[in-house]
C-alpha cells in the first residue's frame, strides 16, 4: 500500500484529490489545503488518487512550502481510460516507480498508490525509492490567515483593512446582517475591495 520512508508510525493522515489544474473540486489550492490540514492536528497530509504521479509534482512542492508535516503521495497509475467497457490505467510498474522517485525528490515522504496500482507497482516503487534521502523538514513560523480556498501570509508588508463591512455604527449594514441580506453585504464588500 505505501512506503513510509523513515517516519515510523504515522496514524492520522489527511489527503485530498487535486484535479489537473492543481485545485480540489471545491477550488482549494495546495498551499491553503496544506495550511488547513496542518491546523487540524493530523500527523501527515498529502494527495491521493487524482492523476498519475507526473501531474502531482507541483502540488507536492507547493504543499511542502507551507507545512512541517510529512507529505503523502498516493497517485493513480496514470489517468483512467475506458477500453472495451473496462477502466484501465496506462502506467506500468517501472514508469510508476520512476515517477514516484520524482515525487519523493519534490518532497513526498510517504509514497503509495491508488487506482490502477497493483502489488507489482508498489514492489517497484519500494525498489526504486527506498534509498532516496528524506527532505529536511523545517518548522514554519509564518502568520497566515485562511479560508477554505485561499490563504494570505501576513508578512512584514502593511495590510490595508477596510471598515466598509464593520457593522459598528452602520445601521443599514446591521439590518442587512440581521435580515441575511447577502446581496447588500456582498455589494459593500466588493465596493471596499475595489477602493
Where would I find each of the regions flagged by the language model?
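Single conserved hydrophobic/aromatic residue that forms the stacking wall/gate
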Residues: 1-11
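Conserved anion-binding
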Residues: 9-40, 44, 73, 80-83, ...
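A cross-family glycoside hydrolase active-site/sugar-binding cleft signature
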Residues: 13-17, 48, 72-76, 114, ...
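Active-site mouth loops of central-metabolism enzymes
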Residues: 16-29, 81-95, 155-187
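Catalytic-face loop-and-helix region of soluble metabolic enzyme cores
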Residues: 19-21, 38-109, 128, 132-134
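Generic hydrophobic/aromatic pocket-lining and core-packing "Φ" positions
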Residues: 30-34, 60, 100, 189
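Terminal amphipathic helices with adjacent charged low-complexity linkers/tails
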Residues: 117-151
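Catalytic domains of carbohydrate-active enzymes, especially glycoside hydrolases
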Residues: 187-195
